[in-house]
Amino acid sequence: MGIKRQQSIQLVGMTEAHWADVSRIYAQGISTGLATFESEVPSRENFFESKIPELSLAALTPEGTVAGWAAATAVSHRPAYQGVVEHSVYVDQEYAGCGVGTRLLAELIALASRHGYWMVQSSIIADNDASRILHGRAGFREVGRRERIARATQGESAGQWLDTYLYELRL
């Protein structure tokens, strides 16, 4: 079933028309306490303002539902860092383990390279094994651990200090 699902997924540029599903999937990630330190889904306006349009993707099912999404933001507005982006990949729980995240990340990397970016990075909560494995398989390297960087607000770790790992891929 996973292979069939993966093959039937179409990657497209994310637009505001995808927001209902994107925000639903984002909320799933928030509730786990492992995907982000956000405590609530941002407004549609704030979400899209912060993302680089050419590095924003939605994975669509044949029915047009979003099965996952990936997006990148600028790390800094300083000219020296103009080629460095930080990204996120979120997959609907129903599609976890079906290759959706792998396809989204591979396409985001290809787009970043095509658009002249030279570094893609991600800060991953230490207990998010699935994301760490995904990034390792995609060629990212772990470059550092930030200990007790933030206190979890959601999930089983709520109230606890958590570590993150910084992963990067030079294009």
PLM regions with names:
Residues 8-22:
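A short beta-loop-alpha structural element at the N-terminal edge
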Residues 26:
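Hydrophobic "lid"/C-terminal helical patch
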